[in-house]
């Protein structure tokens, strides 16, 4: 086997990637400089961007011709709907993403200055509500997958159990 080839044990030509992890909406403001403590400054640009470590991994895998299933949890809000739409548009299976009726979708408030230094406030919201139901989805899908991707934006004990 060539060192650049992945061992793929399914009949597909594409790896099957199972991602169990964070789904967050990034709220990004670009500024000339970081504000001082207690100071309000004017932002130069603002935008929202789908993200979270898990969602970002899923999109990257899908764009590299992998079949991808995403497992996690979002809130029943506009950010959750937007994240699901983004993942579906990237051909990612979202059937196992739970929707929490109480917790909000995870967010990252990101301030980026003109030298690309940033500060981030992460509110994990529904990501921290991942539970046994999502873990069961991982266990049921793991035989399908060649690769299981995990990270730390969901409860740590669930990542450990999934591994």
Region annotations inferred by a language model:
Residues 2-23, 73, 84-99, 110-163:
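Ribokinase/PfkB-type carbohydrate-kinase core domain
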Residues 105-108:
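Short alpha-helix plus adjacent loop in nuclease-associated cores
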Residues 2-73, 78-82, 88-92:
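Glycine-rich phosphate/adenosyl-contacting loop at the front of the ribokinase-like
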Residues 101-103:
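Short, glycine-/polar-rich solvent-exposed loops and beta-turns at beta-strand/coil boundaries
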